[in-house]
């Protein structure tokens, strides 16, 4: 899967990572303890499961990443 966008933001002592994949409208999210190099344009292998996130009272579909590895 090819990464089209990768955003990292700090929340408490975690770094929240949001990755968008080519030809997929749903964001893939995961947490890390440290900042990571930008994955934009990289090919990655993902293990994930579907989930939902509540934003401003709306339920949004997200994918929770269990494992991400650069292919």
Stretches with model-predicted labels:
Residues 24-25, 44-51:
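Generic short beta-strand segments
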Residues 32-46:
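Short nucleic-acid-contacting surface segments enriched for D/E, G, S/T with interspersed K/R
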Residues 15-17, 40-44, 59-64:
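A generic structural signal for short beta-strands and their flanking turns/coil linkers
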Residues 11-25:
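Short, basic/aromatic beta-hairpin or loop at an interaction surface
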Residues 1-13, 67-71:
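Structural detector for short beta-strands of small beta-barrel domains
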Residues 28-30:
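A short, exposed loop/beta-hairpin motif centered on an aromatic-Gly-Thr core
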Residues 49-71:
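OB-fold/S1-family single-stranded nucleic acid-binding modules
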Residues 4-7, 22-24, 54-55, 66:
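Intrinsically disordered, low-complexity segments enriched in polar/charged residues with Gly/Pro
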């Amino acid at each position: 899967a090819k990464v089209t966008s990768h955003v990292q933001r700090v929340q408490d002592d975690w770094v929240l990572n949001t990755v968008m994949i080519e030809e997929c409208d749903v964001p893939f999210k995961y947490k890390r303890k440290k900042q990571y190099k930008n994955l934009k344009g990289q090919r990655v292998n993902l293990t994930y499961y579907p989930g939902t996130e509540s934003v401003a009272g709306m339920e949004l579909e997200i994918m929770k990443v269990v494992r991400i590895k650069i292919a």
